[in-house]
Amino acid sequence: MINRFSIEKVKGLEIIDSRGNPTIRVFVRTNDGVESFGDAPAGASKGTREAIEVRDENGLTVKRAVDIANYIIDPALHGIDVREQGIIDKILIDIDSTENKSKLGGNTIIATSIAALKTASKALGLEVFKYIAGPRLPKIPIPLLNIINGGLHAGNKLKIQEFIILPIKFNTFKEAFFAAIEVYRNLKGLISERYGKIYTAVGDEGGFSPPLEETREALDLIYTSINNAGYQGKIYMGMDPAASDFYDPKKEKYIIDGKELNPTQLLEFYLDLAKEYPIVYLEDPFEENSFDMFGELQNKLNSTIVIGDDLYTTNIKYLKIGIEKRSTKGVVVKPNQVGTISETFEFTNLARRNSIKLVTSHRSGETEDNFIAEFAVGIESDFIKTGAPARGERTSKYNKLLEIENKFGLEYGGKYFYL
């Protein structure tokens, strides 16, 4: 039955992301003229099981994705109630009919799915996070700030992709976030002093990429910056090795810090680091099929949360394996990895039922849209990972969280977080 919530138009638009690469924005409009949009982000380091993007000319355009939105998705969703997220996403999945979303494109599908959700919340006069959360009052997640970059995110010799700080022991998000900024500023000064001002330029996610070669060099810089800022015992450390990127499958070895390590040696390497530094977060420490090694490491690191990103790719099929093997205490949530909001909800609900912590994450290729911040609050994610406190496409998410806390008085999750 056609009503004011019925979808009247779906329209695609080619835009650019924060790396200057093309991506797709999809608009969804109701019969009442209410309209919103969804943007498709893109990762630099991708799991092999992620939804496939539709791109043309060696990735230089997304014209085909725009055509798919305009000529296939538009008529398919015409007249559907925009509040029916499950029905909308099922139609998209059925039309695509592939396991990896390669027909319509994961980018086209997720942009449409996000646009539908945002339009529905707007039509109902609700904030996006409130529309997702329902009657419960969620908490603001703990931010994971990626302040030193390595791996595929940088041009230095560091193999670890992200070195992270976590401001945990604070009463409010604002307090926590601005304390983290103090550490970021201290780090900038330290890098400038030791390596030269040229190395304080920021990378794709707003972090620094000083000319470092070994993991401990980066950890020492961050540890010193935390202490200099006076936040020892309140701001902790984490890493995202993205280990698939420095794994040699032929040798079955990990190439890191000038050494070739087998999985057991790499595990010992992480255990040593956890003894030396206040590391409470470790994401993708092994290559993406190593469910057992993830579990062994998690079992030995009681005070550190081992997280699966490429291990799961926000896919319930792989999460079930991880649950059975007790691989991790946490999962990364990236809606564009699986392709629809409904499938993302299935994933987060299963994780929650099994007491697994949620880490809602941006991608390295982002836009200025702050949807992922609202999404993180709405699902009451334990953490949010959206880069350093620099670059507009990163700060837009943090500013949205500050606004939500100020306007709605939500409590900060870090206040209740115990290691």
Swiss-Prot record:
Query: Primary place of residence?
Result: cytoplasm
Cofactor note as given: Binds a second Mg(2+) ion via substrate during catalysis.
Keyword field: Cytoplasm, Glycolysis, Lyase, Magnesium, Metal-binding, Secreted
Molecular function per GO: magnesium ion binding; phosphopyruvate hydratase activity
Residues in the active site? E205 (proton donor), K334 (proton acceptor)
Cofactor (UniProt):
Mg(2+)
SUPFAM superfamilies the record matches = Enolase C-terminal domain-like (SSF51604), Enolase N-terminal domain-like (SSF54826)
Keyword Cytoplasm set for record? yes
Residues at which (2R)-2-phosphoglycerate binds: Q161, K334, R363, S364, K385
* Reaction catalysed by this enzyme: (2R)-2-phosphoglycerate = phosphoenolpyruvate + H2O
GO cellular component terms given for this protein: cell surface; extracellular region; phosphopyruvate hydratase complex
Q: What does this protein do?
A: Catalyzes the reversible conversion of 2-phosphoglycerate (2-PG) into phosphoenolpyruvate (PEP). It is essential for the degradation of carbohydrates via glycolysis.
Give the matching PANTHER family. ENOLASE
Put simply, this protein is called: Enolase
Q: Which organism is it from?
A: Saccharolobus islandicus (strain Y.N.15.51 / Yellowstone #2) (Sulfolobus islandicus)
